[in-house]
Amino acid sequence: MNWMQATLLFRPKLLDCLHGYNRERFSQDVGAGITVGVVALPLAMAFAVASGLKPEAGLFTAIIAGFLISALGGSRVQIGGPAGAFIVIVYGIVERYGLANLILATAMSGVLLFLMGLFRLGTLIRFIPVAVVIGFTNGIAVLIMLSQIKDLLGLQVAAMPADFFGILNTLWLNLHTVNLAALLLSLASLSLVVGWLRLSRRAQGTRYRWASMVPGSIIALVFATLVTWLLNLPVETIGSKFGGIPSSLPGFSWPEFSWDSARFLLMPTLTLTLLGAIESLLCARIADGMIGDRHNPNQELMAQGVANFVTPFFGGMPATGTIARTVTNIKSGGTTPISGMVHALTLLAVVLVAAPLA
């Protein structure tokens, strides 16, 4: 395969979507992009914090990777960014090898993802047994749940281990540090998320159908923030724990990694690559079913590769297609990759304008 053939194989979906594009569709995409940006803001920060990183790592990823995945990807409506599926993997890499080697592992997975798409391996992902995918993702879900019990109970733990039994042991040893205010606030937020989900289902087909477009997590976030502020509750916030959010994007940074530890990154890199490929293509297939379209899996993998290679050198973390934000994009009227690009620009505006308030 020469470079001309490779160039012909690299064709973003955006180019096809521009045919017949008009002002009406543009306004729909802008509205959807802003909506998804609002939804993505707390999710991006939460995934970064749960992964053992600072909240801005999630924001930078949603901005840079989100823009690149939409602009270069093979799906009309897929939204890219940090994902919950990566939490356990990223946390383990940071704990064992350090942040510099996470950057290296993410960049290497980006190269592998691009090569998978370039050599047309995207179509092979569908042959992975469903049982393997379900077992793998359910295992990740259990570890994510355990890792968040610390914050749910407000435990005073400096750092959580990455392994299953280590997490259980640490939680048990620190149960005496439970913060009652944090526990009650967590339970109230969980109840609100579940209750809002039921309400949104009943609201479909009525004049209150807008409720189904607003995720319960956003409602719970606003509720918890207001309660904490009004009652001055003794709980940690982003500002108290991390010192706020930078009001600008970071410049290019080459990490000082150790080759002695980097040689152990093969399995974490392969895990990031496979998980990112499965998650993004699964999300794209779900989106196809909702809009009656067909994505290009190989182009999508190449876009994921570019995003994951570039983003870590600008303070980001691994990225992939995200189901919740993609579904929100579709329900909000997004029809082309323009909405995903607007979502990224919306988050950029938040960083530039509202970050000093964090």
Predicted regions and their residues:
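Transmembrane helical cores of multi-pass ion-transport proteins
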Residues: 1-358
